[in-house]
């Protein structure tokens, strides 16, 4: 893509960028088994030995076993069963992620059991790691003083997928719970509500996390303005996403997208008082042109306006509010290799 970026309406950078390139292999064997491998060439591994012993660039390395018509087991590095359309949809369809989805541990090694109740209802029961590297990689500024690393860095997730109105209405809801550090846990509630019936595709996502220590680093980064940063304890994040796609014609698609996000400290301590520290909203407009029928080749023009508002509590650390704009003219293509 050709990207032109601005900060506070002043030119920041104009450059060509390859936002996403991936190698993907998938297939099956012996009728009941499947495999899926995917490596991103835009991701960089952590300097320390990863928890799962895999390069951070490997997003998927999993094998599925269809036990019967109802049950399927999946083992290996796989998507965490978070919900929300933006989180779950193929990443090549997303031009700009919310801060929430850009910082969650979405691909982890673990085990998933899927139960298909019928054609309209499916449940997933999953246990995975909650991080790829060690704790030093997970927390941007290290653990707070007196907090010890966890010996059980796992995340348990329960998910429900429901389909209604001839599969036009798609609901996906998940609950997740795990341990970030000793006596410091994390809880996620994520949900996606989708309407997909041509020529419209619309969705509303709600994402919430409550964290004993700030694993996303979005609040903690305000402390690093005047020196070394500090990982903030007892934070929560809330994000809501609205998107509406309209297929104008067989070769044209347009969408508008809006995101609102909030980051809070829910319990005061010696350094941080409780309350809201950041509010973020962004608006996106995109036009997509498909020059070929039945092809994933598309050209797009994407406009982004993002406002990061830091409250007085955050500004007391020296951080400042700002806004960001970006214009992108790009190309997306899935190249099949047999």
What are these regions (language model features)?
Residues 1-3, 11-133, 162-165:
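Outer membrane beta-barrel
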């Amino acid at each position: 893509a050709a990207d032109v970026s601005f900060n506070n309406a002043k030119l920041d950078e104009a450059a060509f960028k390859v936002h996403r390139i991936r190698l993907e292999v998938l297939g099956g064997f012996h009728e009941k088994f499947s495999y899926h491998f995917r490596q991103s060439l835009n991701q960089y591994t952590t300097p320390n030995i990863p928890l799962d012993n895999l390069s951070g660039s490997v997003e998927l390395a999993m094998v599925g076993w269809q036990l019967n018509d109802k049950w399927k087991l999946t083992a290996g590095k796989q998507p965490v069963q978070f919900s929300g359309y933006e989180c779950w949809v193929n990443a090549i369809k997303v031009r700009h992620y919310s801060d929430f989805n850009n910082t969650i541990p979405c691909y982890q090694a673990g085990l998933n059991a899927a139960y298909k109740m019928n054609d309209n209802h499916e449940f997933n029961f999953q246990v995975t790691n909650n991080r790829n590297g060690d704790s030093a990689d997970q927390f941007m500024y290290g653990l707070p003083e007196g907090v010890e690393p966890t010996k059980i860095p796992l995340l348990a997730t329960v998910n429900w997928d429901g389909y209604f109105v001839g599969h036009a209405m798609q609901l996906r809801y998940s609950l997740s719970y795990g341990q970030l550090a000793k006596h410091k846990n994390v809880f996620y509630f994520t949900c996606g509500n989708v309407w997909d019936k041509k020529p419209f595709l619309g969705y509303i996502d709600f994402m919430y996390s409550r964290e004993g220590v700030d694993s996303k680093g979005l609040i903690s980064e305000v402390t690093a303005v005047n020196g070394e940063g500090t990982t903030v304890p007892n934070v929560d994040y809330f994000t809501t996403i609205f998107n509406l796609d309209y297929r104008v014609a067989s070769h044209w698609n347009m969408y508008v997208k809006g995101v609102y996000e909030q980051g809070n400290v829910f319990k005061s301590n010696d350094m941080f008082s409780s309350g809201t520290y950041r509010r973020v909203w962004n608006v996106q407009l995109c036009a997509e042109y498909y020059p070929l029928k039945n092809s994933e080749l598309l050209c797009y023009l994407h406009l982004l306006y993002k406002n990061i508002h830091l409250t007085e509590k955050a500004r007391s650390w020296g951080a400042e509010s700002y806004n960001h704009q970006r214009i992108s003219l790009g190309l997306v293509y899935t190249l099949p290799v047999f």
